[in-house]
Each structure stands twice: as C-alpha cells, then as structure tokens.
From Swiss-Prot:
The modification Allysine is found at residue 7. Type I collagen is a member of group I collagen (fibrillar forming collagen). GO terms for cellular component: extracellular matrix; extracellular space. Trimers of one alpha 2(I) and two alpha 1(I) chains. Keywords: Extracellular matrix, Glycoprotein, Hydroxylation, Phosphoprotein, Secreted. Residues 114-130, 148-166, 214-253, 373-399, 408-427, 469-496, 608-622, 635-662, 691-707, 736-755, 852-866, 900-933 have a biased composition (Low complexity). This is Collagen alpha-1(I) chain. Residues 64-78, 867-881 have a biased composition (Basic and acidic residues). The modification 5-hydroxylysine is found at residues 100, 265, 340, 575, 686, 870, 882.
Length: 966
C-alpha cells in the first residue's frame, strides 16, 4: 500500500516518503522442473567358457542402483488466460528430484503373459487424484514357469575396475521448454508501516484574500513512488520425493584376466543343471553430483497456464561403478529333466564353477546324447533400497537481471488558490462528499514530521493483471562435480523361500545357440613299450574287405571313482571345440522380499561453486489486494497558506502515529463567492497549529505516479519454514528409449569349472562304409608304438619308382591291442638278389607291441589324394545311464581386476516402479545470494489511507506578511 502524508499546504496533498521493505514471503512449493533420466544400461559381456557349475540356492536380493542425476529446471512459462478445464495435455518435463523416499514393498512376480498386438493409441484422460498407498497384500503363489532359454556357459565375474577420474564438465545443453508455473505461494505478511517524514520548512505566508466559497473536496494526490522490492524469500523446503529413476547404466567390464593353464581333459559328462544366479554385488558408490545451477529471480505467481509441450530428454547420468562380485551360492538339488522346450531368449551366464583338480588322462569316450533341457529358474525378488545419499552442495544464486524501464510520468495537477485564514471555529459535522475538483499543483515539501506509532497492517489488495514476461537470461555454466558421497549400507539378506513343486515339463524346443569352445586337454603320457614280437610267417595275398561287424552290446557301467587329489595347474592349451548345449535348470522359488535398508545420514554441506551467469528475468509479480479504507482521522484546523518553499531534504522515515480520536462533526458553512487573486505576500509568522478538523471525504484515485528506479538489493532474510507437502503426483509416462551405447569389450574368461563325473559309454553304432582317402594332414604328435606284425614274405625287388613330392606326416594313431604271435615261416637263406617287387603278402595277425623307436625324419610330402566320400551316419545308440553328480570343486582364487569395457548399447527403459512413501524432509539448503530486482510493474490500485498521527506541538509564530493590494 502507498503511504500518504497530507499537510495543510493550501489544500494540496503531498506524497509522503516510501515505507521500508516488507518482510520476506514464505517459500512456495517446489515447481515442476524436469527430472533427469537414468543412463542406459550397458550390454552384457560375452560369457566365459567352462563347464556349468552346480545350482546353488537363491541368494539374498541385491540393492537397487542410484537414481539418475536431475535435469536442468525449465524456464517459467508464460501465463495464459484462464480457460475451461481441458483434456489432459502431454506430460511436461519432470521437476528436480527431492529427497529419495523409502521404497515400498515389492510385489510378487506375476505370470508372464504373451505379448498381445499393440492397440491404437487412445486419447489421454484427465488426471485423477492419487489414492492413498494400499497395504501390502499377502504373498502370492509362484508365477507360471517362463519359457526356457538356452543357457550359455557361465563366465567368472571380474573384480571391479579402478574408479575413473571425474571427466571435464560437458557442454551446456540447450534451454528446456518453458515449464509450468508453480503453485501460488503463501501470502506474505504485511510489512510495517513506514515512519512519518519530517516536516518541511515553513512557507512564506501570503496575504489573506477575500473569503472564497467553500470548495468541493479535492481529488486525492498522486500515488507515491513504488516501494523498494523486498528481500528475496528463503529457499523453500525440499519437495516430496520424485518417482524412482530409471535403472542406471551398466558399469564397465573389468579387464580380462590371464588364462590359466588347462588341466587334463576328463571324460565327457552330461551337462549339469545351470547354476543359480549369484548374489548381487555390493552397491557401488554413487557418481559425483553436479553443482546446482543458480536460481533465477522469483517470478510472479500467476494463474495456471496451459500445459506445455514435453521438454527434451535429459542427458544420461554418469555410469556408476560396478559392484564387487557376490558370494557363491550353495549347490541345489538336481532338477528333473523334462523334454526339450522351445528355444528361448539367451539367458545371462551363471557364475563359473571352481577349477577342479586334474584327473588322470582317460580314454576318449564316444559322445553321449545331449541331455534334455531343464526348467528355467524363477527370477529373484528385488532387493531393498539403499540408503539415501547425502544431498549435493547448494548452488550459488544467479546474477541479478537488468532493471526494467521507468514508467511514464503522470500529469501534474493545477495549483489551487490559497484562501484566507479563518478563525478557528468549532469542529463541524462531516460534510457530504463533494464533486471532485481539478487536480492541484504539487506543493513544496514540508518539514519531516515526527514519527508516529506504527499502524496495523492493511489487508492484501486484489491480484492485478499479469505483466509481460521478461527476456530469458543466458544459461549458466555447468558446475563442477561435487565429492562422491559415502557408500550406502548393505541391506539384510532375505529369508530363503520354501521350495515349490516341480513344474510340468515344457515342450521340446529348438537347438540352442552354439556354445563357446572348451579348453584343449593336455596330451597324456606315452604308454609302456611292449616286447618285440617274433618274426611272422610270410603272408599271402591281400584279402578283400570284410563285411561290417555287428554292433557290440553296451558294457556295464563301472562304479564311480573317488575324486582324486588336486593336481598342479597345467600349461594353457589351444581352444577346444564347441560343447553341446547344457540343460536348463529347474525354476527356483521366489525368495521373500527383504526389508528396506535404513536411510543414509545426510552428507556434509558442499562448498559454494563459482557464481553462474544471470538467470532469466522473472515474470512480473502479482499486485497485492486492495486494502480496505482505514478509519477517518481527526480533522485539524486549517493553517495559513504558505508560499512555495524550497523542497526540504528527505528525512528519515519515522514510526507511524497512533490513531487519534475523532472530533465531533461541525456544521457546514455557506458557500461564498470567489474572491480576486491576490499577490503573493511576504512570509508571515508561522501560526499555531490548529486542532484536527473533520475527516474529509474519500477522493477519487489520482493519476499514476512515475515509476521510480529499482532500489538496491536487500539483505537476505532468515530461511522460512518448509512449505506443505504437495499432493502426490500421478504416475509419469514411460520415458523414451535412450540412445544405443557402444558395444562393450568381451569379459574375461572365467576359471574352468570342476569336471563332472564321466557318463556311461553308449552303444557303438554300426560301422560306416570306408571312405576314400582324404587329404593328408600335417604331422601330428608321435603316437604310441603299435604292435609289430609278422613280417611278410620277401618278394622280388621291383624297379625303383620316381620319387614323389614329400607329403605331410599324418596324425599318430592310438596304440592298438597286442596281436597274437604269428607263425614262424621258413627263411630264405643265401645271398639276396635284386628282384622285382613281389605281390603283397597277406596281413598277418598283430604281434605284441615292440619297443618305441626313435622318431624318424619327416618324409617328403606326397601328392594330394582325392577327397573321400562322407561315410554313412551310424545309428544312434541308446542313451547311457545318467552318471553320478560330481562333487563341488573348491572356490578358485579371484582373478585380477579387469579393465573397464566400453559402454554397451542401452536397453529399453523399464516401466516406472510403484511410488514409495514420501521421505522425510531434508535439511534446508544454504541461503543463496540475492538477485537483482526484476522490472517494476505498473502501479497497483490505491491503498487505504493511513491513520493520522498525533497532533504535534504548535510552531513559533512567523513574521507578519506585507499588506495585500486593495
């Protein structure tokens, strides 16, 4: 409201001094700024090779990842005219996240249904109010079994990589679209009434003119200049917790550990059931939080405008560090093998089993039939939320905006004529309101009056029209990242669930993806040399190829041997061929939901960052409600009219005067004729101060005053109380899928798993037709010496053939069983003659194995023979008896930490989880610096007239004035 100090200076109303700034208003609720989206998760690494370990029990659920960083707040949108309630618009950018609330209890996993066809997009409905969070229902039964996926060999998880240094701040992103205007803030308390100004110097007394008629009540004086803007309000209390962020990006993969030497190759066993997923690693430390940008100047609280278009997706937050490896679960029971189900999606690799002790080199058995696919295990329940990280450091206030242009100056009123000083009469009755007269000229400033007592604050005026929106400020620089907060405490592990019934076997599925090749076994030691056989009798002509033999009966299965001691680690061999796909494991039961973790302690307050550039100019504030007219003050006696004096110095504002008692109304005097205008006389003596006259009628509003320059910024006031908790917002729409990241580097090969027990040997298939000789292979390792056969009869020497090109040495053959001793034939004595090559003798029975001879020199390569025809496939033998399950091997030592891999492509954003209960209010932030005041708006309606101050003491009489003209 505008304060007035009306003085008896020829009936002219003089504006009084401006009052002091009002107190700081209460903080408004948090505005709906954008909420940042979590970065995309990285692509899973390549699964390592190794046999499948035994299935362990479901481990305790891991902790959830951290929320993403908040996006930049949007600029305030322009205020639109109030219209009817329309349909719900597109979602706007989310606001800055508040303190993270406690996570609600997770529901049990329901049955996974088949994806239906996408329906047409319906029009968005109007938002309904959020209901109160329901109580947690009873635990449901386990969901239906999902389609089994092909399980790859489990690779060992590498250790966490070293924490990377914080990167340089990224470039400043483009300014988001205008956000929605915040809710109307709480009504500020009225400031104290300004002190009464000191009186100006006494004007020169004019000669009394003829008595003029009683003029009508003059119009109200011009409104005073706008008061200085009040100090900036304290920061509002943190808003209620935002919705949980999307899952964070997957951490970088560790460096590939060195491959250990492979052990000797054991017998091929049946694929074991896939192991359970290990415990989730400990929660990584959250990434550094950026310094909050400078807040813009407070905008005017206007009516809610139309909903704006959604803003661009926020930048993805930095990926969190990869958690440490979880502890290995206990082995579970064997699942019942069902028929092979359809090929499912590729499952995540299970943990690698420990490396077993090398056993003795066994004979290579025939490949057994692939086992049936097992049932897929049910996913584990999500773990409790981690503790809330410490709040980031408070950002500095933005730079003040430029002052607004001054308003137009109002018209000056016409100066009225001074009337003669009449005798002090009895106070008359209050007259009726007269016709408004012409505006009078501005009189000289009087002396500063004494400070009156403070009056009661007037009620707030009605809201004025909204001003034009100021120009947008330049975006601030991105702040440096703050220090990383302490890691949250790990949640308590959940209790183990009750095992459920086995599901029905699934339908037969397609063949799974090809597994990674296993490690090549170490060559076994050579066998002992047998005794040299005696010379056999000369054989006859070679016989024709015999008919294929009948298939032998399968032998009885031998008893399982005890596990041997752990052997030394062998040298690394080449990569072996791909193994058969393993069976899917039986679906595990969903474990109970663990309790939510305790809330973390708030972190230390961060230091203020450098001052950012000026924020956007705030919108014009709403003018206050028009105050009600105050009670009329006591009427004073009119003093002698004074001449125009020099304006006095601006006095210090005094306290408002106390309200005086109203005098009795006096009778209205007759209206006299107007007198002639007299010359301005010499200043007369100052008359005694008259008593208060009757209250004047309320004048019409005066012309608008000139807008004064903006005042200096006030000191920051104390922080206000936290605002009320806002109504819980509706569930936000699903965010857009983030950009695909770069493919990460393959993970390190895990340690080899424990070898399984050898399975029974299957029935031998029928012998295939002998194919044509194939291409001669390269020279292999020298084989064990075969048994020496009986020597053939010496034939005549043939003519020597041409020497062919040297051929590659073929692979060594396995040692055959010792043959029976051949019959000794008669030897031909005498000097050997050179004869022709005789016919090839018949092959004699194999003799006993002779001693191993030294390896011969590599012969010349022979010509390449034609490629042999593919032999017929033998009949499939009966499935062998399932072997005993091997004992679990010891846990191998952890490998060295791996180097971080590249960022993988982001997966599709998951649906937003259920909103948790609101968290407790955080500690208030540090008061920011005051911004420059915004442009001054047009003057509001005239406020109520202040109460009259107490009557001052009479002044000294002035000097007599000169006589007037006749």
């Amino acid at each position: 409201s505008y304060g007035y100090d009306e003085k008896s200076a020829g009936g002219i109303s003089v504006p009084g001094p401006m009052g002091p700034s009002g107190p700081r208003g209460l903080p408004g609720p948090p505005g709906p700024g954008p909420q940042g989206f979590q970065g995309p998760p990285g692509e899973p690494g390549e699964p390592g090779s190794g046999p499948m370990g035994p299935r362990g029990p479901p481990g305790p659920p891991g902790k959830n990842g951290d929320d993403g960083e908040a996006g930049k707040p949007g600029r305030p949108g322009e205020r639109g005219p109030p219209g009817p309630q329309g349909a719900r618009g597109l979602p706007g950018t989310a606001g800055l996240p508040g303190m993270k609330g406690h996570r609600g209890f997770s529901g049990l996993d329901g049955a996974k249904g088949d994806a239906g066809p996408a329906g047409p997009k319906g029009e968005p409905g109007s938002p309904g109010e959020n209901g109160a969070p329901g109580q947690m229902g009873p635990r449901g039964l386990p969901g239906e079994r999902g389609r089994p996926g092909a399980s790859g060999p489990a690779g060992a998880r590498g250790n966490d990589g070293a924490t990377g240094a914080a990167g340089p701040p990224g470039p400043t992103g483009p300014a988001g679209p205008p956000g929605f205007p915040g809710a109307v803030g709480a009504k500020g308390e009225a400031g104290p009434q300004g002190a009464r100004g000191s009186e100006g110097p006494q004007g020169v007394r004019g000669e009394p003119g003829p008595p003029g008629p009683a003029g009508a009540a003059g119009p109200a004086g011009n409104p005073g200049a706008d008061g200085q803007p009040g100090a900036k309000g304290a920061n509002g209390a943190p808003g209620i917790a935002g919705a949980p962020g999307f899952p964070g990006a997957r951490g970088p993969s560790g460096p590939q550990g060195p491959s250990g030497p492979p052990g000797p190759k054991g017998n091929s066993g049946e694929p074991g059931a896939p192991g359970n997923k290990g415990d989730t690693g400990a929660k990584g430390e959250p990434g550094p939080t950026g310094i909050q940008g400078p807040p813009g100047p407070a905008g005017e609280e206007g009516k809610r405008g139309a909903r704006g278009e959604p803003g661009p997706t926020g930048l993805p937050g930095p990926p969190g560090e990869r958690g440490g490896p979880g502890s290995r679960g206990f082995p579970g029971a064997d699942g019942v093998a069902g028929p092979k189900g359809p090929a499912g999606e590729r499952g995540s690799p299970g943990p690698a089993g420990p490396k077993g002790s090398p056993g003795e080199a066994g004979r290579p058995g025939e490949a057994g039939l692939p086992g049936a696919k097992g049932l897929t295990g049910s996913p584990g329940s999500p773990g409790p939320d981690g503790k809330t990280g410490p709040p980031g450091p408070a950002g500095q206030d933005g730079r003040p905006g430029p002052p607004g242009p001054p308003g137009a100056r109002g018209q000056a009123g016409v100066m009225g004529f001074p009337g003669p000083k009449g005798a002090a009469g009895e106070p008359g009755k209050a007259g009726e309101r007269g016709v408004p007269g012409p505006p009078g000229a501005v009189g000289p400033a009087g002396k500063d009056g004494e400070a009156g007592a403070q009056g009661p604050p007037g009620p707030a005026g009605p809201a004025g029209e909204r001003g034009e929106q100021g120009p947008a400020g330049s975006p601030g620089f991105q702040g440096l990242p703050g220090p990383a907060g302490p890691p949250g405490e790990a949640g308590k592990p959940g209790e183990q669930g009750v095992p459920g019934d086995l599901g029905a076997p699934g339908p037969s599925g397609a063949r799974g993806e090809r597994g990674f090749p296993g490690e090549r076994g170490v060559q076994g030691p050579p066998g002992p040399a047998g005794p040299r056989g005696s010379n056999g009798a000369p054989g006859g002509a070679p016989g024709s190829q015999g008919a294929p033999g009948l298939q032998g009966m399968p032998g009885e299965r031998g008893a399982a041997g005890l596990p041997g001691p752990k052997g030394d680690r062998g040298d690394a061999g080449p990569k072996g061929t791909d193994g058969a796909p393993g069976k899917d494991g039986v679906r595990g039961l969903t474990g109970p939901i663990g309790p939510p973790g305790p809330a973390g302690a708030p972190g230390d307050k961060g230091e203020s960052g450098p001052s950012g550039p000026a924020g956007p100019t705030g919108a014009r504030g709403a003018p206050g409600d028009r105050g009600e007219p105050g009670p009329p003050g006591p009427a004073g006696f009119a003093g002698p009219p004074g001449a125009d004096g020099q304006p006095g110095a601006k006095g210090e504002p005094g306290d408002a005067g106390a309200k005086g008692d109203a005098g009795p109304p006096g009778p209205a005097g007759p209206t006299g004729p107007p007198g002639p205008i007299g010359n301005v006389g010499a200043p007369g003596p100052k008359g005694a101060r008259g008593s208060a006259g009757p209250p004047g009628a309320t004048g019409f509003p005066g012309a608008a005053g000139r807008v004064g320059p903006p005042g200096p910024s006030g000191n920051a006031g104390p922080p206000g109380p936290p605002g009320p908790v806002g109504k819980e917002g509706g569930k936000g729409p699903r965010g857009e899928t983030g950009p695909a990241g770069e493919k990460g580097s393959p993970g390190a090969d895990g340690p080899a798993g424990a070898p399984g027990t050898p399975g029974p040997q299957g029935i031998s298939g029928q012998r295939g037709v002998v194919g044509l000789p194939g291409q001669r292979g390269e020279r292999g390792f020298p084989g064990l010496p075969g048994p020496s056969g009986e020597p053939g009869k010496q034939g005549p020497s043939g003519s020597s053939g041409e020497r062919g090109p040297p051929g590659p040495v073929g692979p060594p053959g396995l040692a055959g069983p010792p043959g029976e001793s051949g019959r000794e034939g008669p030897g031909a004595e005498g000097s050997p003659g050179r004869g022709k090559n005789g016919d090839r003798g018949e092959t004699g029975p194999a003799g006993p194995a002779g001693p191993a001879g030294p390896a011969g020199a590599r012969g010349p390569a022979g010509p390449q023979g034609p490629r042999g025809d593919k032999g017929e496939t033998g009949e499939q033998g009966d499935r062998g008896i399932k072997g005993h399950r091997g004992f679990s091997g010891l846990q191998g030592p952890a490998g060295p930490p791996g180097s971080p891999g590249e960022q993988g492509p982001s997966g599709a954003s998951g649906p937003a989880g259920p909103r948790g209960p609101p968290g407790s209010a955080g500690s208030p932030g540090k008061d920011g610096l005051n911004g420059l005041p915004g442009p001054i708006g047009p003057p509001g309606p005239r406020g109520r007239t202040g109460d009259a101050g107490p009557v001052g003491p009479p002044g000294p009489p002035g000097p007599p004035g000169p006589p007037g003209p006749p």
